[in-house]
């Protein structure tokens, strides 16, 4: 029994959508073949976009196409890294899964008996849940500081790209500082918009309490 960091296969439809999206930037990935071949093609994509203006957007869309990595005693490999067996610990930061790995390595290297699988699977589940809570808190704190920062720039114009499309409006990520805000649907005209389209916006509203940024499109 051992805690692994596992990462399942991505949904085939999401892979196809990702490949369609990155084609507009001149990239492509494999959407069929062995999991190792597909994984390596995605890693090549992430290498190819480094230091390019589209890096942040392509990385974000790529992550949305992937399953979330988690901890488990039931090993299925790590798709993103193309490893059949993968676990880890960090230094000097110590997360609880790091401590489990340390303790079990010490136990097994000393010839100790295996541990209860059910107990460690429960600990892995708890660690995965806490990791997600921490990630959500990090995103919320980053968003708070973005809104605070842009709140001092009301009325200013910035160039960006459409990073998301929902029934409520368009999300735009700014090229200069990677802040993201929304252009509400009520403020949009009849034009056609798609992910990755370049746009120019004006900072319209910044609600720090709700951590919301509203942009207005500037027609050029």
What are these regions (language model features)?
Residues 1-5:
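Glycine-rich phosphate/pyrophosphate-binding loops
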Residues 8, 13, 18, 23-220:
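Structured C-terminal cores of nucleic-acid metabolism proteins
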